[in-house]
Amino acid sequence: MKRFIRHPLLLSSVASVLTVAQIALAFFFNQPGLDALKWVGWICLWTSGVFGMLPIITFRRKGGVAKGESYMKTTVLVDTGIYAIVRHPQGGTAWLLINLGVMLVAQHWSSVTLGLASMVLAYVDSFNADQSCIEKFGDVYERYMERVPRVNFVAGIIRLVRRRERA
């Protein structure tokens, strides 16, 4: 699998700008809308916080990160905890949930447009992240990819439960 974009930070940088713009516009164009959708949006936003924070804790504990180094500087593949559910909890699942949550809370076309564009870029960037992990961890990561979904946490939870039932 080839990288979609050669510059490693291009997609995430553009997606970041779109997400910041989406959030800023949501404050200005927050429409009265369906309260149920707003509640679902807030649930998405709080859930994104879980997927955003757990990798920091998990990588520090299980990733072989040297003291004083960034939690991203892992030396071993982590496939437990949140990483047994999704492969990209921060740059994938959390990002998508933030975009979705803001869309549902704001309920405005500008929020939906910016959010969808950011979601597409973040998802495509997860393919680049997979490629980087294959280069770093090799066949072990490719086998991990077969067990754990990229960003779909519902499918990840179902697969995890099924694996545990078989064990």
Regions found by a protein language model. Name each.
Residues M1-T80, A94-A167:
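Membrane-anchoring alpha-helices and their flanking helix-loop junctions
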Residues I85-T93:
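Histidine-centered phosphotransfer motif of kinases
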